[in-house]
């Protein structure tokens, strides 16, 4: 074969030579194979796909109403008051309109529910779950603006309308100042507690300066939002206890607290969408006054940013400016509460399924944050004296939660059970699915006299109860296990749901049959006619 190709090439060159063609040049221009320089992208490694709950959850036409009682909270708006004899015991809790209210609503197990007709599902191959399809958060008490402040606030001078250059700050220039906070209305619904974010004190590298007076490094931290945590009031979401050592830069209610802001980005990107079915949010704020801080400035203003002054402007004032926030007017026209909301499609993969028979409702409402002033007389005299009266502050809150739940069923196929086990193995454990241990081949010991002191104790240890994974967090527990009702038309939210869904309530009363006297009189009239 090789000899044949050589002969062909020889005769080709001879022909080109006779024809007067440069055959060597044509030979060099022949196509030659070269490796491709283009980058080849291989497909990614296949991973398990997260699907919506609608893929494996079948909804029924059975709906239930559940509602809480009137929920009330009373306390001091700025701080909790401990017992003088026992500081670990709180006499008056801290209840502020600038706090999160996180309700952990407990639902009954539908698999242990007494249904009039159980033919709609097979308990051997299916399990029942609740789906939240409607909610209404009721808020009592009048609209009002709550005031917060500090009797020793680090406020040096007014930087908005100052007509002369201020003098240098003295040893202590703190003043008594109050203000209102940013206006916030918020509602978060999910079957897991919401996640918050705040800026805390980070860990500096070994080579960085971390001596006394150095600026601490910042780190964005994510934590669970608990009941009673403070919201962002207009001074940022941060750990004020760790990042403000003077305890005078912000009002009393947050100077030693952590202000958290919901991590909407993190909860929206959650794989299974359990923390955030949907949320309602309304925020507004404007700046009322402009001040600056007293104290030694840790970072000087660069000299290339200004020309040096003379006389009273030779020494620069502090450039640590700060505003006082204000939420402006509150109005009933911009309320998010006291109205129903229907969940048709959640923003995540969990379309309202209440895993673990629980649902979390997180509420913030600063439009009802009035702080009431109470006064008691300590000494009675004919003339008015300040020392004869004691002043107290209290804040009250009133809530009412109503739900519409839809009964759903899940077919326990191998793929579905594997998927649920990957998502949350506690769900299968609550459904009493588990691995059965193989029979033991060891010989067991059995004593005759089990109460004898001559042998080891034969008392079996009681089974340990399942530990609550959220027991270290603080929530407002709401038990609705005995407050479900199928008579939707007997409750306000139930009637709204029937109207919204186009259902009609079944009549409960039957028409009474005509009496014998009326029938006989009708017959007599017919005969006369």
Swiss-Prot record:
Belongs to the papillomaviridae L1 protein family. Self-assembles into homopentamers. The capsid has an icosahedral symmetry and consists of 72 capsomers, with each capsomer being a pentamer of L1. Interacts with the minor capsid protein L2; this interaction is necessary for viral genome encapsidation. Interacts with protein E2; this interaction enhances E2-dependent replication and transcription activation. It comes from the Viruses. GO terms for cellular component: host cell nucleus; T=7 icosahedral viral capsid. Its main location: virion. It holds the Pfam family Late_protein_L1. InterPro entries: Capsid_L1_Papillomavir, Capsid_L1_sf_Papillomavir, dsDNA_vir_gr_I_capsid. One of its GO terms (biological process) is endocytosis involved in viral entry into host cell. GO terms for molecular function: structural molecule activity. Gene3D superfamilies: Major capsid L1 (late) superfamily, Papillomavirus. Residues 506-529 are annotated as: Disordered. Keywords: Capsid protein, Disulfide bond, Host nucleus, Host-virus interaction, Late protein, T=7 icosahedral capsid protein, Viral attachment to host cell, Viral penetration into host cytoplasm, Virion, Virus endocytosis by host, Virus entry into host cell. This is Major capsid protein L1. Forms an icosahedral capsid with a T=7 symmetry and a 50 nm diameter. The capsid is composed of 72 pentamers linked to each other by disulfide bonds and associated with L2 proteins. Binds to heparan sulfate proteoglycans on cell surface of basal layer keratinocytes to provide initial virion attachment. This binding mediates a conformational change in the virus capsid that facilitates efficient infection. The virion enters the host cell via endocytosis. During virus trafficking, L1 protein dissociates from the viral DNA and the genomic DNA is released to the host nucleus. It is found in: Virion; Host nucleus. The gene is L1.
């Amino acid at each position: 074969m090789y000899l044949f190709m050589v002969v062909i090439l020889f005769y080709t060159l001879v022909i080109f030579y006779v024809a007067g063609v440069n055959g060597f040049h044509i030979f060099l221009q022949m196509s030659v194979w070269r490796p491709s320089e283009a980058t080849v992208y291989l497909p990614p490694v296949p991973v398990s796909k997260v699907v919506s709950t609608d893929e494996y959850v079948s909804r029924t036409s059975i709906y239930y109403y559940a509602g809480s009682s009137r929920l009330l909270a009373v306390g001091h708006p700025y701080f909790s008051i401990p017992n003088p004899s026992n500081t670990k015991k709180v006499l008056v809790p801290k209840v502020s309109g600038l706090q999160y209210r996180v309700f952990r609503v407990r639902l009954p197990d539908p698999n242990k529910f007494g249904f009039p007709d159980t033919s709609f599902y097979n308990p051997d191959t299916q399990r029942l779950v609740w789906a939240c399809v409607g909610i209404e958060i009721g808020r009592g008490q009048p609209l009002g603006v709550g005031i917060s402040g500090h009797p020793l606030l680090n406020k040096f001078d007014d930087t908005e309308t100052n007509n002369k250059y201020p003098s240098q700050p003295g040893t202590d220039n703190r003043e008594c100042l109050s203000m209102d906070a940013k206006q916030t209305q918020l509602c978060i619904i999910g079957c897991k507690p919401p996640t918050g974010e705040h800026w805390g004190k980070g860990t500096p590298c070994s080579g960085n300066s971390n001596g006394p007076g150095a600026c601490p490094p910042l780190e964005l931290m994510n934590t669970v939002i608990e009941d009673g945590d403070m919201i962002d009031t207009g001074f940022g979401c941060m750990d004020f206890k760790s990042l403000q050592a003077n305890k005078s830069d912000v009002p009393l209610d947050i100077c030693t607290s952590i202000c958290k802001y919901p991590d909407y980005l993190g909860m929206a990107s959650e794989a299974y969408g359990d923390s955030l079915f949907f949320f309602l949010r309304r925020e507004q704020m404007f700046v009322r006054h402009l001040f600056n801080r007293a104290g030694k400035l840790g970072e000087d203003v660069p000299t290339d940013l200004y020309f040096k002054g003379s006389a009273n402007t030779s020494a620069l004032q502090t450039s640590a400016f700060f505003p006082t926030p204000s939420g402006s007017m509150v109005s009933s026209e911009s309320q998010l509460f006291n109205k129903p909301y229907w969940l048709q499609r959640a923003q995540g993969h969990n379309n309202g399924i209440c895993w673990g028979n629980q649902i979390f409702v997180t509420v913030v409402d600063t439009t009802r944050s009035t702080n009431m002033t109470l006064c008691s007389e300590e000494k009675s005299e004919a003339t008015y004296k300040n020392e004869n009266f004691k002043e107290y502050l209290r804040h009250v809150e009133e809530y009412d939660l109503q739900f519409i739940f839809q009964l759903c069923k899940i077919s326990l196929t191998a793929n579905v059970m594997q998927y649920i086990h990957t998502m949350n193995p506690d769900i299968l454990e609550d459904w009493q699915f588990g691995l059965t241990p193989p029979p033991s081949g060891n010989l067991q010991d059995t004593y005759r006299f089990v109460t004898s002191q001559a042998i080891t104790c034969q008392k079996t240890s009681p089974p340990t109860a399942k530990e609550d994974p959220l027991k270290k967090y603080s929530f407002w527990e709401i038990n609705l296990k005995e407050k479900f009702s199928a008579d939707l038309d007997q409750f306000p939210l139930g009637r709204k749901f029937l109207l919204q869904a186009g259902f009609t309530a079944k009549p409960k009363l039957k028409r009474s049959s005509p009496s014998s006297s009326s029938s006989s009189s009708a017959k007599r009239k017919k005969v006369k006619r």
